Amino acid sequence: MSTSTTRRVKLANLAPDFYKALIELDKVSDTGLDPKLAHLVRIRASQINGCAYCTDMHSLDLMEFGAEQQQRITLLPVWREAQKYYTEQEKAALQLTEAITLISVDHVPDDVYEIAAAAFDEKDLAQLIALIITINMWTRVGVTGKMEPGHYKP
């Protein structure tokens, strides 16, 4: 990991139209999905992409649903070994999140897609895919801009 102190451009200031469009996209990316599921998806993609800011932000958001969420957040990187803490829909969503986030590894395998398609109706599946794509954009903004955790307040 780089410890460079190179100043990074702030997209919010220098590409404001893009940044505003991303904010608007984010507002509709989880429409109709369970908020806890949506935050788990955001956290998992953020962990995979190494975005500390996004991981912190969405963990804090999920904690707003109660202290019992802490264990689910803690176990998220190893959710396959801790399946009893996640619903069937959440497990399907997490598996799809990992496939889409790591798309260069194996694209989105048919079996992963089929599990998600069985767990969600078509509209919610489309919304889930939109959410995963959106958080992946945000994590790239956060990592590229070296956004630091600890500044977000729910």
Where are these regions (language model features)?
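Hydrophobic alpha-helical segments
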Residues: 1-154
